[in-house]
């Protein structure tokens, strides 16, 4: 059980106080000592300042904060990167931006957006992203069913997208009219997910990607550079007057797209930042979220983002008497935050909690022909294994369909992942890293050298030592059959054989003379089986037999007793 602040203070009181001299010791006989002790107890046992109404500063929060166990022990969470940009079947994850670009340049993931939009919705001078939002109904969204399913898969926390770069809020925002209650689904999506998370006792987080708003929408103020519509302004230039008699009457496109570039004054930009802050303070407090996750390499809008986080922590402290929430993002050595690594993982064991985010295909669900699966159950499980061996959590995106349901072909993969997680749960949840995360590291490179040119090999080596976007996909060579990862729990060591094949593997790090001070192994068991596994331990290696018959075809996990 987690030691509370009160427990620590009581422990402090219970310890004997060493007096410097006899004169000091005589005060214990004085009548007023009871009064002093009473005051002292009142001080140390009083709740944190924020729970009494005083807002703690960032520095004061740093002194008190500890990462909550629900997060550090979770190891596996599920995220739905789902919003209005899912509505178009094609066009990539930046559809709202790319629909206004005849030429997307190097951003080739959005190359179909402009043509698809013209064919499906009309020309962006009349029908822009505002009209895509209007078409999005989320008609089959059942948040209870989704949370029940995600919990069955073994997810220990859940995250929903609150807004994307498109500046559209998936919650009932007091400060932003372009939200899912006013437009599109006419539902408080975050509110529904929040209630279902509580119902199924799963910590709930929200992701925000809106701090790119100021530059992300600039193409909406352009026009075609060629063709019959050349020079006709896109709908970013529309005003409230243009909406009279239309479905969006009363709404101002400028609240969604921003002002045209030539009208953006420093004062207006400050108002945008202040509005962002108000929206996100409301998001964090109204829905009592357990995690705020920002898609950026620092606090959104600097001090504004930091103030949102300060409010978030204080709200949690005031309501529960402790800080049990998490702020995550692509931070670098930022106290009170979890480091997030997009589509990849750390290249070493990190001392503090972190998470790797992954998706099987694209972030938003798309059917573009050039967008096949990057991952299947095998590669996701391998990524999860690598991440938890380095003290991280895997946050896996589930690409919901526009109607709010899980695509059937994705469900097949998710079911396989869930079966593996549930089978090997003892080696996953609440596990800790060992002295080193793995053995026979990058042995696959030895097997790849015969079939790959020098440039490809160098790219693989670089990928193995990077972080963001270092994911190993279906296109990459498989792990060598002897490459393993480690986790621990108590006095047990768990060995994850990433790409198991029948036969023996040698693990040098588990020899009796290993620099990691390995003890004599007593027994080895394949999780999912009651049969002991044959092995041989010498001074320089542990030889482990991987059986052909296993309950699951993916990464094989062995419980090793005695080594630690």
Predicted regions, residues:
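N-terminal signal peptide c-region/cleavage motif recognized by signal peptidases
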Residues: 46-48
């Amino acid at each position: 059980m987690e030691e509370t602040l009160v427990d620590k203070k009581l422990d402090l009181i219970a310890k004997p106080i060493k007096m410097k001299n006899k004169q000091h010791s005589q005060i214990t006989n004085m009548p007023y000592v009871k009064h002093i002790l009473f005051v002292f107890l009142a001080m140390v046992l009083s709740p944190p300042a924020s729970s009494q109404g005083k807002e703690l500063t960032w520095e004061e929060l740093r002194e008190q904060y500890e990462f909550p166990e629900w997060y550090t022990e979770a190891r596996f969470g599920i995220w739905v990167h789902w919003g209005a940009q899912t509505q178009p079947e094609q066009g990539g994850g930046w559809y709202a931006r790319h629909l206004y670009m005849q030429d997307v340049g190097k951003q080739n993931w959005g190359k179909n957006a402009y043509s698809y939009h013209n064919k499906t919705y009309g020309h962006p001078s009349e029908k822009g992203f505002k009209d895509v939002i209007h078409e999005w109904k989320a008609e089959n969204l059942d948040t209870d069913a989704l949370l029940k399913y995600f919990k069955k898969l073994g997810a220990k926390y859940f995250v929903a997208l609150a807004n994307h770069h498109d500046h559209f809020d998936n919650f009932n925002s007091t400060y932003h009219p372009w939200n899912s209650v006013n437009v599109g689904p006419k539902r408080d999506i975050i509110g529904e997910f929040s209630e279902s998370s509580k119902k199924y006792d799963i910590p709930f987080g929200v992701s925000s990607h809106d701090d790119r708003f100021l530059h992300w929408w600039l193409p909406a103020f352009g026009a075609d550079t060629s063709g019959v519509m050349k020079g006709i302004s896109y709908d970013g230039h529309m005003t409230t007057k243009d909406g009279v008699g239309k479905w969006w009457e009363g709404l101002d496109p400028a609240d969604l797209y921003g002002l045209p570039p030539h009208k953006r004054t420093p004062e207006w930009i400050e108002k945008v930042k202040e509005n962002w802050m108000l929206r996100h303070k409301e998001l964090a407090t109204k829905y009592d979220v357990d995690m705020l996750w920002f898609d950026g390499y620092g606090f959104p809008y600097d001090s504004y983002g930091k103030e949102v986080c300060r409010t978030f922590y204080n709200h949690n402290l005031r309501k529960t008497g402790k800080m049990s929430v998490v702020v995550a993002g692509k931070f670098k050595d930022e106290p009170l935050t979890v480091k997030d690594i997009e589509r990849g993982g750390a290249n070493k064991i990190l001392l503090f909690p972190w998470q790797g985010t992954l998706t099987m295909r694209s972030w938003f669900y798309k059917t573009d022909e050039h967008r096949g699966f990057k991952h299947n159950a095998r590669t996701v499980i391998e990524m999860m294994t690598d991440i938890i061996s380095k003290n991280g959590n895997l946050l896996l995106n589930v690409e919901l369909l526009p109607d709010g349901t899980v695509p059937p072909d994705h469900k097949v993969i998710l079911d396989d992942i869930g079966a593996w997680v549930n089978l090997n749960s003892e080696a996953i949840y609440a596990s800790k890293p060992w002295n080193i995360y793995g053995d026979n590291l990058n042995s696959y490179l030895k097997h790849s050298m015969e079939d790959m040119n020098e440039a490809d090999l160098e790219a693989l080596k670089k990928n193995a030592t990077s972080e963001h976007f270092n994911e190993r996909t279906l296109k990459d060579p498989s792990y060598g059959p002897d490459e393993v990862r480690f986790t621990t729990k108590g006095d047990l060591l768990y060995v994850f054989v990433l790409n198991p094949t029948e036969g023996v593997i040698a693990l040098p790090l588990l020899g009796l003379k290993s620099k990691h001070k390995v003890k004599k192994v007593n027994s080895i068991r394949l999780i999912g089986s009651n049969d002991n596994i044959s092995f041989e331990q010498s001074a320089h290696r542990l030889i482990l037999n991987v059986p052909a018959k296993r309950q699951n075809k993916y990464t094989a996990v062995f419980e090793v007793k005695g080594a630690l």
